Amino acid sequence: MFSTILIVCTGNICRSPIGERYLQQLLPSKNISSAGTQALVDHEADQSAVEVARKNGISLAGHLGRQFTSKLSKEYELILVMEKNHIEQISNIAPEARGKTMLFGHWLEQRDIPDPYRKSEEAFASVFKLIEQSALLWAEKLKA
């Protein structure tokens, strides 16, 4: 099925790094990475994201933000985005990637996973739970 998966959010410092690392734990044989549509290039993961991930057994150590590009899109068979508007942004950057782009929250009734950047610890915890639920559902589908 899909052996290369790219997880995309806006800045690539909160949601997509968590999604990447969580999904990688669930699917160790897959090549999973992340990027942002408006990435904070070379920035480490947001400290609140690092903390909520750590509390849930996920390490974001070594993560550096990177920009989604048309060239990058060609390296992945499946692109999972956090919000519906990311699908349009991906299509604008790499029109050829539209057909392989889906919502990370696809199996949660096409749910957007909101951006917790600069929000409360509770917001990060809530977003982590959505990412966790979505990752578990994607892993189930991608193992089949």
Curated annotation (Swiss-Prot):
Enzyme class: hydrolase
Keyword annotations of the record: Hydrolase, Protein phosphatase
Gene3D superfamilies (UniProt xref): 3.40.50.2300
Keyword Hydrolase: yes
EC number(s) stated in the UniProt entry for this protein: 3.1.3.48
Record-linked InterPro entries: LMW_PTPase (IPR050438), Ptyr_pPase (IPR023485), Ptyr_pPase_sf (IPR036196), Tyr_phospatase_low_mol_wt (IPR017867)
Pfam family membership, one: LMWPc
Hydrolase keyword on record: yes
Active site: 9, 15, 115
GO MF annotations in UniProt: protein tyrosine phosphatase activity
Catalytic reaction list: O-phospho-L-tyrosyl-[protein] + H2O = L-tyrosyl-[protein] + phosphate
Family named by the database record: Belongs to the low molecular weight phosphotyrosine protein phosphatase family.
Protein name: Putative low molecular weight protein-tyrosine-phosphatase
